[in-house]
Amino acid sequence: LKDGLLDTGDIGYLDDEDYLYITGREKFVIVNKGGKNIYPEEIEEHLKTSNLVKDSVVFSSDDKNIIVIIQPEELVFKNRHLDEVKKIIYDCVLDTNKQLESYKRINKVYITTNDFKKTSTQKIKRDFLRDFKSTDYILAN
């Protein structure tokens, strides 16, 4: 307990009608060079609206580049060469970027064919990002 409240690490807000909205987790927040907060979960939710994206992880290794690793849906690979897959996923990210404020836009896109490891509640385990090596993934842009 902290100040009489349970500290879960969740970040959110109450709207005018006192509805609670969870926007992210405190430990995942990216603070860019301009001091603006970027919530990876918000960007991931935008990407999930595409039927091309099975899963994604958004992060920053240097607080100026917003990076995404995308696991495309299997249909994206069907009867396509890798260059076509890369273009399809990159175009999907460009569409997502149009919906985001400029400081939240993704500027590096990687593709993986592997499933992300998940918790028992089906959230992606982000601990692998500490050892992120771009050579382990397919660059899409």
What does each of the following model-derived ranges do?
Residues 11-102:
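AMP-binding/adenylate-forming catalytic core of the ANL superfamily
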Residues 1-2, 48, 130:
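Alpha-helix boundary recognition
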Residues 4, 10-11:
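Active-site metal-binding loops of divalent metal-dependent hydrolases
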Residues 3-4, 28, 36, 114:
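Flexible, active-site-adjacent loop/turn segments at secondary-structure boundaries
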Residues 1-3, 16-17:
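Adenylate-forming AMP-binding core of the ANL superfamily, especially NRPS adenylation
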Residues 7-8, 22, 111:
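A structural signal for the hydrophobic beta-strands that form the central parallel beta-sheet
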Residues 30, 94-141:
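Conserved C-terminal "lid"/linker of ANL adenylate-forming enzymes
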